């Protein structure tokens, strides 16, 4: 049951990221990096930014 809730939250967050990035793209069409930056911020663990993940 928890997995379903987690997936629902994840879908909501991803939808919000899409909306925010779309709004940012409208405001600043020359700044392509913003949407990719947002996706990285939301979907990668913090250690991925520093490159300290141990797999």
Swiss-Prot record:
It comes from Crinia riparia (Streambank froglet). The keyword Methyltransferase does not apply. Residues 16-41, 54-55 form a propeptide. Expressed by the skin glands. One of its GO terms (biological process) is defense response. Keywords: Amphibian defense peptide, Disulfide bond, Secreted, Signal. Its main location: secreted. Disulfide bonds join 47-53. Residues 1-15 form the signal peptide. GO terms for cellular component: extracellular region. The keyword Acetylation does not apply. This is Riparin-1.5 acid. It is found in: Secreted.
């Amino acid at each position: 049951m928890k997995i379903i809730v987690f997936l629902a939250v994840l879908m909501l967050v991803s939808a919000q990221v899409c909306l925010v990035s779309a709004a940012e793209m409208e405001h600043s069409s020359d700044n392509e990096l913003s949407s990719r930056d947002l996706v990285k911020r939301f979907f990668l663990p913090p250690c991925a930014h520093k490159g300290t993940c141990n797999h």
